[in-house]
């Protein structure tokens, strides 16, 4: 049941963000793609034996997230870390390109910034305090790259 509650809480945060983005940036192409592509009905928990920790399929046809600190363990991650991960995944939906391109990184940073403004995410500098997520370590947060220009 905890997993369902975590996914629901993450979805509510995304919906809050989407409302803000729609009001502030209704004609921005990346926002339009995100508004069109995000669908809470396709949000799923990744099973522990999966090769993935999080992914979005076909720009929003499926969105899956691992909810544990470690694979094959029952301890769940905190909502702020899950929010960071889902914001990463919806940044793929907002991008035309596939993968971790310059466009994606710029969209991710934009989405993180807007999530902080919407008070749905508290930014953490993972370079100073890395966190465990589904057997991996998150060590970077583009939110703190304010003055950095991304290159391909």
Which residues fall in each region the model found?
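Active-site recognition of the HExxH zinc-binding catalytic motif
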Residues: 81-96
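Metalloprotease/metallohydrolase-associated module, dominated by Zn2+-dependent proteases
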Residues: 2-77, 97-152
